[in-house]
């Protein structure tokens, strides 16, 4: 479990009393015998739905192209004709408009908080009174987008809250 934290565990057993073990190993789902095809398919589908941000996106650092999983991008900052992405402690760029980039990014994972900044909801450590903290930096959600952000962030937290 410690080696591959992204792995979703679906525990399948004939002994219902083993559900405590499922909690102990942080199983995503518990399925008991007799197995029903629909129940197995639902468990697998739900597990796949939580695996967000794995699609790669191309960014450049010192004119070298890198394929970065979207989940690793913390913040996107728009400039005139390009965007800059904060990936961990690295700053990478891409010659693309913010509008075009938003069409490429996973909409379940990214939210545009104002005309210049897009945040990855996985990396938001706290939100209070229109202020977001991502890593060590603070960002302000525009007043116009505040209510919608709160709704989107709440839904994200309920649906994907344990995902990292």
Question: Where is each model-derived feature located?
Answer:
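CheY-like receiver
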Residues: 1-54
């Amino acid at each position: 479990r410690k080696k591959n934290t992204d792995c979703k565990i679906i525990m399948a057993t004939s002994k219902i009393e083993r559900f405590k073990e499922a909690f102990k190993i942080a199983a995503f789902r518990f399925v008991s015998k007799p197995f029903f095809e629909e129940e197995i398919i639902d468990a697998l589908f739900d597990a796949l739905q939580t695996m967000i941000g794995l699609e790669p996106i191309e960014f450049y650092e010192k004119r070298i192209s890198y394929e970065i999983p979207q989940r690793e991008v913390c913040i996107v900052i728009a400039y005139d004709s390009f965007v800059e992405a904060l990936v961990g402690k690295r700053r990478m760029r891409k010659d693309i408009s913010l509008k075009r980039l938003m069409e490429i990014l996973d909409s379940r994972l990214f939210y545009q908080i104002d005309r210049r900044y897009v945040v990855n909801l996985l990396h938001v450590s706290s939100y209070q009174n229109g202020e977001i903290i991502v890593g060590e930096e603070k960002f302000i959600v525009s007043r116009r987008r505040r209510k919608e952000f709160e709704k989107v962030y709440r839904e994200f937290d309920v649906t994907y809250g344990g995902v990292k």
